[in-house]
UniProtKB/Swiss-Prot annotation:
This is Cytidylate kinase. It is an enzyme of class 2 (transferase). Its main location: cytoplasm. It comes from Pyrococcus furiosus (strain ATCC 43587 / DSM 3638 / JCM 8422 / Vc1). ATP binds at residues 12-20. It catalyses: CMP + ATP = CDP + ADP; dCMP + ATP = dCDP + ADP. The keyword Plastid does not apply. It comes from the Archaea. One of its GO terms (cellular component) is cytoplasm. The gene is cmk.
Length: 192
């Protein structure tokens, strides 16, 4: 692993494996794990709302998203932190490594169904509705198209590997990371 202060963001849609990966990274490297989804869920619980109710509430109250984002940006000032959230890669502009995890919606629905003890069909509908709401909200609030993956350094389809396989890929990326500058760029010589 490169020496120094690393800030890594891990983003992805529901059921893509972001939390699993972040837990493994935090455990292996001793990184602090900042989880935007947990912040959001805690805020819903504080207001006595389900996640779905709070999602709709947040659409009308942009201060909710801004508070979650503020906490992520604040966390990025620390060293050796992995920040998990759908917009983490967008919010933490100077992250050393920005990762996006993806998987087909059917695979993600199966994972969410197992995790939440609901049917795959229920999970599919919840995910589809939530993603539509989030996409609209992020576009209106920040002008961010969540489907634009151009800002990410590493994009992984987690349906192709086990959680340990995904971790191995990311570990290799971290262990060979050149956080100073752009390892692949051709620097122009200064002309004087």
């Amino acid at each position: 692993m490169p020496k120094g202060c690393l800030v890594i963001t891990v983003s992805g849609l529901a059921g893509s494996g972001t939390t699993t990966l972040c837990r493994k990274l935090a455990e292996h490297y001793g990184f602090k794990h900042v989880y935007a989804g947990l912040i959001f869920r805690q805020m819903a619980k504080e207001r006595g709302m389900t996640l779905e109710e709070f999602q709709k509430y947040a659409e009308l109250h942009p201060e909710i998203d801004r508070e979650v984002d503020r906490r992520q940006i604040e966390a990025a000032k620390e060293c050796n932190v992995v920040i998990e959230g759908r917009l983490a890669g967008w919010m933490v502009k100077n992250a050393d490594l920005k990762i996006w995890l993806d998987a087909p919606i059917r695979v993600r629905a199966e994972r969410v169904a197992r995790r939440e003890g609901i049917t795959v069909e229920e999970a599919f509908m919840k995910i589809a509705e939530r993603e539509m709401q989030n996409r609209k909200r992020y576009l209106n609030l920040y002008g961010i198209d969540i489907n634009d993956l151009s800002i990410y350094d590493l994009i992984i389809d987690t349906s192709k590997w086990s959680p340990d396989g995904v971790f191995a890929i990311v570990k290799a990326a971290i262990d060979h990371l050149d956080p100073v500058g752009d390892a692949g760029s051709k620097k122009e010589k200064e002309v004087g």
